[in-house]
Amino acid sequence: MAEEIRKILEQLLNSISGLYCILISDRDGVPIIMVQNDKAPELAMKPAFLSTFGLAIDRGSKLGLGKPKTLICSYSQYQVIQMNKLPLIVTFIASDCCNTGYILCLETQLEPILSNLTLVVTET
Amino acid sequence: MEKHIERVMDDIISSPNVFGCVFVDHQGLCLGVKGDASNESAGIIGAIADQAAKLEPQSQPPIIVMEDDTKSCIIHRNGTVTGAIYKTN
């Protein structure tokens, strides 16, 4: 199953120019599956960075607007888009000029993969 | 700003045969949507305009028309804003 998922993710990665990495991790930021190219920044793929999303959505939910679904962080050279699919976190790392809206569209395409992975994570 | 874009979209949607429109910024994020159109298509519309512009990089941004038997979608980029208009043939 892992190979199939990796293949699908690689296809998605190659379909968007400027997208460097797609990473699916658990709520602690531990990577479950990851596809990347050589431009992906190492630091943004570490659990220390990924797990801050969990804290951010906890804080964000206190704004009274419901649970955050997506977090977009725009940096000078990169943008990091994280989706709340708890118990999973989906992270996209892309260049700053990459089409953010197009990456957000991938959510529906990832849904079948995520439902499979969620089953695995909740069982373990 | 919203009022201005709302007015533009109202003008567009009141044109004959037009049933929807979407406006997208340079990052593919939805600026506004009116009628029978989805804000989820914003990113794809931006990407289509980007890819089509790469065919002739020296020229002005192209007008892209996609049509089927009954409907058509017209996409055009002007500066940082891309607009898509859906209309019946």
Which residues are covered by each model-predicted region?
Chain B
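Non-catalytic interaction/Regulatory regions outside core domains
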Residues: 1-89
